[in-house]
Amino acid sequence: MGFSVEEARYLAANADQIAQVAPEVALTKTSVFADRAVLDRHFGDYARAVSVLIASQRAAAGKFPSHWLTDDAAVQQATPARVARVRAERIAAAGAAFVHDVTCSVGSEAPAFSAVGLDWLGSDLDLSLIHI
């Protein structure tokens, strides 16, 4: 489930606190009520968004750094880092100097393009993704 713009702003502003609390929640079927109590205590009305963020960050392994702000849809749609690296190398070898990813979501391919020396700009129609 995605985030509203308000939730995205909250998550960005509270990323450090979320990172500190994340190890306290397992986010399993058997821990759901205990996890929700922890998240409610720390984040109140934003507990659902924080839960989605933590679960999504954990699922992002192999696609982009786990500390990035993301949601479950962005993780599912993200290009795996190895695939992004090959794509970036091919585009650089073709002589491009600049890449504009018009549907970048959370920008999972940006590090690969940066690593091969290409300038990269990402945009997306989803305003909440722009905020995260």
Language-model features: locations:
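S-adenosyl-L-methionine
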Residues: M1-A94
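Conserved class I S-adenosyl-L-methionine
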Residues: A96-T103
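Conserved SAM-binding loop of SAM-dependent methyltransferases across substrates and taxa
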Residues: V106-L118
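Conserved SAM-binding motif I beta-strand of class I
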Residues: D119-D124
